[in-house]
Amino acid sequence: MTEELKLMGANRRDQLLLWLKESKSPLTGGELAKKANVSRQVIVQDISLLKAKNVPIIATSQGYVYMDAAAQQHQQAERIIACLHGPERTEEELQLIVDEGVTVKDVKIEHPVYGDLTAAIQVGTRKEVSHFIKKINSTNAAYLSQLTDGVHLHTLTAPDEHRIDQACQALEEAGILIKD
């Protein structure tokens, strides 16, 4: 990496923000690092600094995404649901949800020491579900729900409540949804 080709400090963060805003799909830390001619760790630090300034960037399993107000308003209905299943049913669970036109925004567990732990998922298609599952498997990462014997919450978003109702019905029929 030559010094004159590197993007520096605030200029680099401005450029990262521009790339994320212009991108139609998530950008990985590695992709951003290559574009900026810096290490992935520098990108992680830059993203943290941008988030600290309340820039709406989320980290998903596919990479970083800029969530502008228009994108957030596009998904108008939102609901938190409780689920219970083992790790072997995660792909089935996510597919049942996205098949109804619903996006799984995140997963949340209640940890006995740390309290609520939330991780962004942001999957809305079978392709994104497949990518998420492959990434979990290739990194040997554990699902958060494994820390709570399969109990977890998901925040679901969709253009309307009916789609979320349909996804919940599919999860209930599969024995995954925890009802009140």
UniProtKB/Swiss-Prot annotation:
<keyword id="KW-0805">Transcription regulation</keyword>
<dbReference type="InterPro" id="IPR013196">
    <property type="entry name" value="HTH_11"/>
</dbReference>
<keyword id="KW-0238">DNA-binding</keyword>
<dbReference type="GO" id="GO:0036094">
    <property type="term" value="F:small molecule binding"/>
</dbReference>
<comment type="subunit">
    <text>Homodimer.</text>
</comment>
<keyword id="KW-0804">Transcription</keyword>
<dbReference type="GO" id="GO:0003677">
    <property type="term" value="F:DNA binding"/>
</dbReference>
<dbReference type="Pfam" id="PF02829">
    <property type="entry name" value="3H"/>
</dbReference>
<dbReference type="InterPro" id="IPR036390">
    <property type="entry name" value="WH_DNA-bd_sf"/>
</dbReference>
<dbReference type="InterPro" id="IPR026043">
    <property type="entry name" value="NadR"/>
</dbReference>
<protein>
    <recommendedName>
        <fullName>Transcription repressor NadR</fullName>
    </recommendedName>
</protein>
<dbReference type="InterPro" id="IPR036388">
    <property type="entry name" value="WH-like_DNA-bd_sf"/>
</dbReference>
<dbReference type="Pfam" id="PF08279">
    <property type="entry name" value="HTH_11"/>
</dbReference>
<comment type="function">
    <text>In the presence of nicotinic acid represses transcription of the nadBCA and nifS-nadR operons. Also binds to DNA upstream of the niaP gene, probably regulating it as well. May bind nicotinic acid.</text>
</comment>
<keyword id="KW-0678">Repressor</keyword>
<dbReference type="InterPro" id="IPR004173">
    <property type="entry name" value="3H_domain"/>
</dbReference>
<dbReference type="InterPro" id="IPR035922">
    <property type="entry name" value="3H_dom_sf"/>
</dbReference>
